[in-house]
Amino acid sequence: MSVTLHWFLPTYGDSRHIVGGGHGIPAGAAHSDRDASIDYLASIVRSAETFGFTGALIPTGAWCEDAFITAALLARETTSLAFLVAFRPGLVSPTLSAQMAATFARHAPGRILLNVVVGGEAHEQRAFGDHLEKDARYQRADEFLDVVRRLWAGETVTHRGEHVDVESASLALPPTPVPPLYFGGSSAAAGPVAARHADVYLTWGEPPEAVRKKIDWIRSLGEEQGRKLRFGIRLHTISRDTSEEAWAQAGRLIAALDEDTVRNAQAGLARSQSEGQRRMLALHEANRANGSWTDAHSLEIAPNLWAGVGLVRGGAGTALVGSHTEVADRIADYAAIGIDEFIFSGYPHLEELYWFGEGVVPILRKRGLFGAAADLAAPASIPFVGSAR
C-alpha cells in the first residue's frame, strides 16, 4: 500500500521552540518567533509540494488565522498541493459553506479537502456566537453535512431540522470532483456522524493499539451505513540522521519550558470538553505528576512516540522521534493497522519539513510506502436522502 502525506501550516506563527495555544488554551496564548506571513507559509507549501506531499492542513480557531482565506491566498503559490481546510459547521450556513468549497474547487480543481471541526471548547464557540452544547453541535453537524452533500450532488434542498433550516437551496456550479471530508472525534457522539459523512476519519497520535481500537470502532459504524472510510493520523515529527540527535532535539524543546508555563497550559487544557484532548492529556499525566517531564525519554509513551509537545500545545500533542529509519518504521506500523494518511508538523515547520522530506521520504519510497501515485482520498459513497466529536 502507499500512504498519503500531508504537512501542517502554523497560521498562528512558528518558532524553534514548541508554540503553545490550540484547543483549550485562550487566543493570544501562543508565543512565536516567526510571523505567519503569506510569504513564510508559501515557503512551506512550496517545499511540501517539492517533496511530494499531497496536502497541507490549515487549522481553525480563535488562536490562528482564517483557514479559507489563507488557503485561497496560497493556492496561487503552488501548482498541485491540496489544502485541507479546517472549518466549523454552523458558524456560517451550509449553503454558503458548500458554495465556498465549490468555488475553490472550480478555480483549483482537486485541491480542496475539508476538515470538519465540531469544536471542543464551549467558551471558544461562544466567542463565535455559537451557544450549543457539545452533543448538540454533533447533531447540528449531522444535519449540516447532509445538506452540504446534497447541494454538492446538484440537488435543490429544503431542510427543516432542529439546527439547520434552509429552503430551496442550490448551487449554480456544483463541484467536480466533490471535496473529500475529513472528520475527527473520540466521543460517543462523534462516531455515528463520522460514519455517515466522513471520507477520512482522523485521530490524534495515540499509541498504535489505541489507534487500532478507534479504527475498528469507526470501521464497524461505517459498515452499518454501507460505507468504507479511510483513516488518517495527526502527528508531529523530529527526525534526524541518528536517534541520539533526534532525542537531543526533543530535549532542547522541553528544556525551554518552565514549570509555570506547563502548569498554566495544562490547567487550560484540562477544561476542554474534547474527549480527544482528554486522551492526549492522559498520555503524559503520570510524568507531570511526578515531575519527570523534564527528561525527554520519560515522555516516550510507545516506541519513538513522544508526548512532550502536549505539555503546552492543545490538540495534537505527540511526535514521532528518532532516526529517519525509526520514523519510517513507525509510519509503517501505523499503516499496517489501517492508517492511510499522515498529517505531520514540527518545530520550526519549514526546517523540520526538510529533515523529514530529505530523510524519511526516500526511505518510504524505497519501501513502496510512498510515491507519486498516492492519490487524494476518493469521496466515499453517501446516501443523500435523510440524514460531531
PLM features: residue spans?
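Conserved, mostly hydrophobic/aromatic
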Residues: 48, 52, 74, 104, ...
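Hydrophobic faces of well-ordered beta-strands that scaffold small-molecule active sites
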Residues: 3-9, 55-58, 82-87, 112-116, ...
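N-terminal beta1-alpha1-beta2 module of alpha/beta enzyme domains
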Residues: 1-80, 176-179, 385-387
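Acidic-and-aromatic substrate-binding clefts and catalytic sites of carbohydrate-active enzymes
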Residues: 56-67, 90-95, 207-213, 239, ...
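Glycine-rich anion/phosphate-binding loops
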Residues: 91-106
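Active-site beta-loop-alpha junctions enriched in small/polar residues
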Residues: 10-12, 61, 86-90, 117-121, ...
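Short, acidic/polar
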Residues: 31-47, 183-193, 320-335
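An alpha-helical appendage that flanks or caps ligand/catalytic pockets
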Residues: 2-22, 29, 128, 134-175, ...
